[in-house]
């Protein structure tokens, strides 16, 4: 509960000029040796109707003088207790500190408000649970170099502490402290300064790092592989896209080799690649292009590398195709196709590798991206004996319609050169036939055509099976026509096994009475027919 007087003191903003010193003293609005106190707004006070101070500055002054009443008033006017503690420390008013100690909380929160190193250290001493390391760490954070200098001899005895303070100074970007530690103390791991500088893109800290590195090399006879270190820095700077950092490193030596430019490409920093690309040999540029493909670099980076090679990549076509297929990175294929001159079409080469090694999903994506016909892919799949691909692509391309699929696969068989590929296509045709329930009267014409197809391609077992299936449809006249037609095919193409199967079916039809001796004689009158069948059985009948 506030007294009426305290409520007035807290909220009164305008004082009558007629109030004398005695009245102001009774109201608690008089500051000895300074004059009347008047609140202005929320953050300022007017002293003796003339001087304006911030509430916190006035609070610091009052605490320094040990004026408890004014301190109490200014705290009532929402002054920050931390400034009272600072003032008390400046005036050695420990009685006042003791009075408010329980309200202070964490004394470390006061430290950022202090500029004087001595007061800073005295304030830190208020935290009885802290040690010298805590003081030094806060001295680094708040740029109190003189405190570090004061305790230099003590710091020097603890190498781990030196490293902690150095790393903290780097992270806090306190360059003056970093420089002092670098020149005055032994730093075990100097690399921290470069790590922090690169992480925060702090060029001034990075430059300071090299200053300290050269000092360390020249004064400590340190066993440091500077060349290797410079390459690491170049690689890290390239990965971060920090060209100015790379140029700074190059002042001390180092070389922008392919590993450095690999990093720039991996992290998509084209400008760095553009700056150095003309300094590396053609073979390195070729390797960079392959790396760009593998990391799926953007269009501008690929164009930069291709342009540097004058779009001539014939020496690395195999590696390029392999990289495109393995890393599913097809942009370079498009760029090479877009050229008016020196156009290079890698679609077939990439597609062949995809068909050989990659999944159906990858292949479909490529087909759609480059508008590749399904027939083209199926022929490649047949050469590589990838039955599953043939089936899946056929279903997707021709809407899983059996007759349409069979029709297109039959057409492909005629142009398929490797016999193994042709056999696989015929196998797929028969597989579709067997799994699609086509053995119905409505499909009679298509089965007839398929049987003649098997005969033309000397597919013996499948021909025999489909003839048996066709006979089961109970179309005797058409079956006779099929058999006679296929016999003619067998004789013309010199397929003795097909002719033998046909001969068996003809005998069967003859014994059933479905074909006459005259019809058989006419069929067997073909030139060289006697080479494929034995006509004695017919003569004996």
Swiss-Prot record:
The keyword DNA-binding does not apply. Transmembrane segments: none annotated. The keyword Nucleus does not apply. InterPro entries: MGF_505. Induction: Expressed in the early phase of the viral replicative cycle. Disulfide bonds: none annotated. It comes from the Viruses. Keywords: Early protein. Pfam families: DUF249. Belongs to the asfivirus MGF 505 family. Plays a role in virus cell tropism, and may be required for efficient virus replication in macrophages. This is Protein MGF 505-10R. It comes from African swine fever virus (isolate Pig/Kenya/KEN-50/1950).
